[in-house]
Amino acid sequence: MYAVVQVRGVVKTNHEIKDTLKMLRLHHVNHCVLVPDTPAYLGMIRKVKDFVAYGEVDKDTLATLLRTRGRLTGDEKLTDEYVRAHTPYADIDEFAAALCDGEMSFRDLVEIKPVLRLHPPRKGYKTIKRTFQQGGALGYYGPQINDLLYKMR
């Protein structure tokens, strides 16, 4: 499972980029979505790689994000009680593990909001004009996306 975070805004960009970000449900900077590892999603991510940071998220980071930033309709927090009542899992940690393993989908919970609204990273981005490999904040992070997500929790 990939975590995709929008890093740059879309003013004066190609309409195809804007449409792809809209399909990924990334409407604002510092919003995060979780997408499965499928060729269709990877193609969309590659198209917007100059505007997002993405990588493979692990179970612990995903559980932390769901606890702090997971929201239900009505802007209520995602709780262990809600997960216990609406899934076969006992708490958010087990639900996050099932999400990472592909056993469960974010869409299986009807009332959960698909976008995680994150804070800007503590200590800031390095630069939003260069890729991660060049010392910036854009593009493919790999497993190091967990460090960025922890700073944005």
Swiss-Prot record:
Keyword Ribosomal protein attached: yes
Gene3D superfamilies (UniProt xref): 1.10.15.30, Ribosomal protein L30, ferredoxin-like fold domain
Record's keyword terms, sorted: Ribonucleoprotein, Ribosomal protein
InterPro entries, sorted: Ribo_uL30_ferredoxin-like_sf, Ribosomal_uL30, Ribosomal_uL30_arc, Ribosomal_uL30_CS, Ribosomal_uL30_euk_arc, Ribosomal_uL30_ferredoxin-like
CDD domains: Ribosomal_L7_archeal_euk
UniProt signal peptide: none
Gene Ontology biological-process entries: maturation of LSU-rRNA from tricistronic rRNA transcript (SSU-rRNA, 5.8S rRNA, LSU-rRNA); translation
Top-level taxon of origin: Archaea
MF GO annotations: RNA binding; structural constituent of ribosome
A GO term from the CC aspect: cytosolic large ribosomal subunit
Pfam families: Ribosomal_L30 (PF00327)
Family (UniProt): Belongs to the universal ribosomal protein uL30 family.
Subunit structure: Part of the 50S ribosomal subunit.
Entry protein name: Large ribosomal subunit protein uL30
Species for this entry: Methanoculleus marisnigri (strain ATCC 35101 / DSM 1498 / JR1)
Source organism phylogeny: Archaea, Methanobacteriati, Methanobacteriota, Stenosarchaea group, Methanomicrobia
Gene (UniProt): rpl30
